[in-house]
Amino acid sequence: MAILTLTCPACQKLFSFTTHPAFDTGEDASIAEKVRTGEAFVGTCPHCGHAEHYSYSFLYKERESHALLYYADNEEDFRKACAIMTGRDPSVPWAGIADWSRRVVANRQVLLEKLLLLDLHLDDRVIEIMKVLAHSFLQKQKPGLLVDAIWFERGADGRTGYCLYQNGKICLLYTS
């Protein structure tokens, strides 16, 4: 845990914000939802009440799923996390995590997708292959349609599926 002194973007006054290098659902089950909603990363200025989302690198450990997700906020942390997750960092006891699912992600959308897949007990590798196949199929059916991203998401109605985005907006939706 680290305590940072930040300047509020609204009132320009200083306040303290606590970051956590790791979130372990085995130690605090409520943290799983706070990470998913973003609440774990919100700092609220005690002077004016302005709430701001702060991004920083952290490890997410879900013991019941044997899953480790490292969110890397910068390139240096990304490289370090890759070394840890692949057993190339001698300071980490590799035997303890060798049989765990280990992923390093570099943006919040990918993190949220991986967490959703954990919740649904789906293999993210299969989902990634399905996204490539969906994109390939789409290119054959609609060659002029350019897709920026394909995400596996849960809709407001609770259904899950693939959302294809074009210019930041959903252009196609395949649900289960």
Question: Which residues fall in each region the model found?
Answer:
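N-terminal cysteine/histidine-rich coordination modules
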Residues: M1-A72
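Short amphipathic beta-strand and strand-loop transition segments with alternating hydrophobic
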Residues: T5, V147-R154
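Domain-exit/linker segments immediately C-terminal to small folded modules
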Residues: T44-V126
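Short Lys/Arg-enriched alpha/beta "domain-start" segment
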Residues: V126-I127, V132
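Long, low-hydrophobicity ectodomains and other hydrophilic envelope-associated domains
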Residues: H135-P143, I150
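Extended, well-ordered protein cores
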Residues: Y162-Y165
